[in-house]
Curated annotation (Swiss-Prot):
Residues 1-22 are annotated as: Disordered. The keyword tRNA-binding does not apply. It comes from Homo sapiens (Human). The nucleosome is a histone octamer containing two molecules each of H2A, H2B, H3 and H4 assembled in one H3-H4 heterotetramer and two H2A-H2B heterodimers. The octamer wraps approximately 147 bp of DNA. Disulfide bonds: none annotated. Residues 7-19 have a biased composition (Basic residues). GO terms for cellular component: extracellular exosome; nucleosome; nucleus. PROSITE patterns: HISTONE_H2A. The modification N6-acetyllysine is found at residues 6, 10. This is Histone H2A.J. GO terms for biological process: heterochromatin formation. It is found in: Nucleus; Chromosome.
């Protein structure tokens, strides 16, 4: 009867992170903590860190996809800063967003001014016809 331990107690559900509830890989809890500690506002709503984590995850996925394509175009299996640079600078919107950002070891986009290219002479034009 009594004294046999807790028999009718509530079973606590397994803890589920806010990231998994939102279906995200980025840490919602960490983003929330950083928003609170960063003195951006006196109070931080419950939806703000979820939204911010989702935006950060989307931007990261977008950049990594383009950088992966750049790595594959260069016949490489590892993404290096050069691939990130090529991905960002060749995408119009990402270039506008990250226009003032310098990527270490990124290099520059290959570009030769049209004026500097050798002109086709008359003899080359007649040979090609």
């Amino acid at each position: 009867m009594s004294g046999r331990g807790k028999q009718g107690g509530k079973v606590r559900a397994k803890a589920k992170s806010r990231s998994s509830r939102a279906g995200l890989q980025f840490p919602v809890g960490r983003v929330h903590r950083l928003l609170r500690k960063g003195n951006y506002a006196e109070r931080v709503g419950a939806g703000a860190p979820v939204y911010l984590a989702a935006v950060l995850e989307y931007l990261t996925a977008e950049i990594l996809e383009l950088a992966g394509n750049a790595a594959r175009d260069n016949k490489k299996t590892r993404i290096i800063p050069r691939h990130l640079q090529l991905a960002i600078r060749n995408d119009e919107e990402l270039n506008k967003l990250l226009g003032k950002v310098t990527i270490a070891q990124g290099g520059v986009l290959p570009n030769i001014q049209a004026v500097l290219l050798p002109k086709k002479t008359e003899s080359q034009k007649t040979k090609s016809k």
